[in-house]
């Protein structure tokens, strides 16, 4: 399970250094193989390959009424591998789709990660914090 936030920068070639605490788990559980695709909230999702395969099956089973969402998730998916120095290449197409130029936030979201443009993430987080909490949290104890 992945959790926590990391402020990271892409290098000039669009590569992201995976934090060591996540890299070790990804190498052990997924042989360093990841799949990256678009998220409907404007960020990217990074899945360890075994988790991607489960997600892909669920998406593939959706009805024809969800065809565009199948295209968004599956048609934009790119398989990548963590290189010898712990980096993954974020394709230009995916960087453009998420508005990512250099500064990013990598968020552990349990079984996958979200990769955000840092400024976009900070703005959306601030907006969410100013709003009311969703009803699902009304009986949640902190």
Curated annotation (Swiss-Prot):
Residues 5-51, 77-120 form the SpoVT-AbrB domain. CDD domains: MraZ_C, MraZ_N. GO terms for cellular component: cytoplasm; nucleoid. Keywords: Cytoplasm, DNA-binding, Repeat, Transcription, Transcription regulation. It comes from the Bacteria. It holds the Pfam family MraZ. The keyword Nucleus does not apply. Forms oligomers. This is Transcriptional regulator MraZ. It comes from Verminephrobacter eiseniae (strain EF01-2). The lineage of its organism: Bacteria, Pseudomonadati, Pseudomonadota, Betaproteobacteria, Burkholderiales. The gene is mraZ.
């Amino acid at each position: 399970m992945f959790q926590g936030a990391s402020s990271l920068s892409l290098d000039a070639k669009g590569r992201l250094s995976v934090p060591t605490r996540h890299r070790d788990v990804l190498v052990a559980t997924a042989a360093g193989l990841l799949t990256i695709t678009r998220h409907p909230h404007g960020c990217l999702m990074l899945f360890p390959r075994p988790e991607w395969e489960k997600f892909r099956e669920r998406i593939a089973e959706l009805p024809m009424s969800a065809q565009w969402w199948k295209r968004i998730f599956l048609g934009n998916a790119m398989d990548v591998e963590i290189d010898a120095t712990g980096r993954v290449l974020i394709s230009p197409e995916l960087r453009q789709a998420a508005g990512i130029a250099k500064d990013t936030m990598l968020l552990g979201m349990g079984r996958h990660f979200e990769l955000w443009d840092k400024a976009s993430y900070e703005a959306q987080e601030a907006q969410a914090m100013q709003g009311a909490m969703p009803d699902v949290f009304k009986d949640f104890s902190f």
